[in-house]
């Protein structure tokens, strides 16, 4: 049976995962037009999550960040004045779409808030139960 602390741990793991997601989106937006030191475009980063079962109770599942994956690819624009332009005048830009990143950010924030609400409600139930036992 799930105890109160496991419920708090599950909500906390969800908040952790969404915080990683928000940080990844922020990094993508910050590097929207960035290049690596070798002149290649910054690759979009995407967190990869995995479900981890509680070994003591398989009905309890936590969220874990398995890795932060680079998504290869780029956009081509014509800008012959750019120092990173190729011999035809095209520049490879990062494969980051700001609108998609903002949608991902909004989704991550809402998921974080839902986990925070679940955490807060669980804590409140615990506090009220403890008060009733006094």
Swiss-Prot record:
It comes from the Bacteria. PROSITE patterns: FLAGELLA_BB_ROD. One of its GO terms (cellular component) is bacterial-type flagellum basal body, rod. The keyword Repressor does not apply. Keywords: Bacterial flagellum. Its main location: other. It is found in: Bacterial flagellum basal body. One of its GO terms (biological process) is bacterial-type flagellum-dependent swarming motility. The keyword Metal-binding does not apply. PANTHER family: FLAGELLAR BASAL-BODY ROD PROTEIN FLGC, FLAGELLAR PROTEIN. Belongs to the flagella basal body rod proteins family. The basal body constitutes a major portion of the flagellar organelle and consists of four rings (L,P,S, and M) mounted on a central rod. The rod consists of about 26 subunits of FlgG in the distal portion, and FlgB, FlgC and FlgF are thought to build up the proximal portion of the rod with about 6 subunits each. This is Flagellar basal-body rod protein FlgC. The lineage of its organism: Bacteria, Pseudomonadati, Aquificota, Aquificia, Aquificales. The gene is flgC.
């Amino acid at each position: 049976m799930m105890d109160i602390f496991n419920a708090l741990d599950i909500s906390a793991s969800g908040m952790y995962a969404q915080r990683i997601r928000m940080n990844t989106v922020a990094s993508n937006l910050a590097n929207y037009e960035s290049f690596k030191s070798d002149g290649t475009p910054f690759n979009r980063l995407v967190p990869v999550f995995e479900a981890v079962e509680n070994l003591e109770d398989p009905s309890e599942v936590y969220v874990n960040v398995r890795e932060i994956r680079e998504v290869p690819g780029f956009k081509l624009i014509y800008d012959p004045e750019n120092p990173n332009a190729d011999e035809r005048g095209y520049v490879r830009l990062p494969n980051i779409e700001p609108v998609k990143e903002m949608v991902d950010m909004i989704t991550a924030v809402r998921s974080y808030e839902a986990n925070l609400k679940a955490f807060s409600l669980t804590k409140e139930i615990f506090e009220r139960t403890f008060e009733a036992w006094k």
